[in-house]
């Protein structure tokens, strides 16, 4: 398995043996239950589908209920899947349990989550634009973005132009976070630094795919 789903509990700090404070995020990773094994013959790709947490069957729809009953597992708070290479497909069966133990010897992880939504924001907050003059004849345009185009040619606003709009509530991945501690008894993963999302939000935690060149040297 390349990764698991965790729930953000919040941030705290730890002290190393030299007394240096390390900011860490606490992530709870409860045992996962395998709900489906996907393969190239039936699905066109290889993946392991899992669920975690608990949910009453009366709170999920009939197709989901049937899927869980067919897999022989209790309903969870959601369903996720992790793709695998055909050659490296783990030997798992429906109903198998996967725990935080898979991160025991992992040093770095990539974490994906939905960032905090901040609503409609202007260009200064959203894109770090410079403010216009506070005085010197300027009025009503202190936080305005300025020109968004050229002239009759090209006669349009280019796609991707940085303007005001929705800020936050994006899918964000933070790469190469250091694993500080893996507590198997409490199902807790402690990683150095901040991760996207609110407390209680779901996070996808995977083993890092990129290698830090300096550490490799």
Swiss-Prot record:
Positions carrying N5-methylglutamine: 152
Pfam families xref list: Ribosomal_L3 (PF00297)
Posttranslational mods: Methylated by PrmB.
Keyword field: Methylation, Ribonucleoprotein, Ribosomal protein, RNA-binding, rRNA-binding
GO CC annotation terms, alphabetical: cytosolic large ribosomal subunit
A single GO BP: translation
GO molecular function, one term: structural constituent of ribosome
SUPFAM superfamilies in the cross-refs: Translation proteins
Domain of life where this protein originates: Bacteria
NCBIfam families documented for this protein: L3_bact
Family to which the UniProt record says this protein belongs: Belongs to the universal ribosomal protein uL3 family.
HAMAP family linked to this entry: Ribosomal_uL3_B
Quaternary assembly: Part of the 50S ribosomal subunit. Forms a cluster with proteins L14 and L19.
Function: One of the primary rRNA binding proteins, it binds directly near the 3'-end of the 23S rRNA, where it nucleates assembly of the 50S subunit.
Protein name per Swiss-Prot or TrEMBL: Large ribosomal subunit protein uL3
């Amino acid at each position: 398995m390349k990764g698991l789903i965790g729930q953000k509990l919040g941030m705290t700090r730890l002290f190393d043996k030299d007394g240096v404070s390390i900011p860490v995020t606490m992530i709870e990773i409860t045992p996962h239950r395998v709900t489906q094994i996907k393969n190239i013959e039936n699905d066109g790709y290889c993946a392991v589908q899992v669920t975690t947490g608990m949910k009453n069957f009366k709170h999920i729809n009939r197709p989901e209920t049937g899927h869980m009953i067919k897999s022989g597992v209790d309903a969870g708070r959601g369903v996720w899947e992790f793709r695998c290479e055909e050659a490296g497909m783990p030997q798992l069966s429906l109903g198998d349990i996967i725990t935080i133990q898979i991160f025991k010897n992992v040093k770095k992880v990539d974490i994906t989550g939905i960032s905090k939504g901040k609503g409609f924001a202007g260009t200064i907050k959203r894109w770090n634009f410079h403010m216009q003059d506070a005085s010197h004849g300027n009025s009503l345009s202190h936080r305005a973005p300025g020109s968004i185009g050229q002239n009759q040619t090209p006669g349009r606003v280019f796609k991707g132009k940085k303007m005001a709009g929705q800020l936050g509530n994006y899918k964000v991945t933070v790469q190469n976070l250091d694993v500080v501690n893996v507590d198997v008894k409490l199902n807790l993963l402690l990683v150095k630094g901040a991760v996207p999302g609110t407390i209680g939000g779901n996070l996808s935690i995977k083993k890092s795919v990129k290698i830090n060149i300096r550490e490799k040297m």
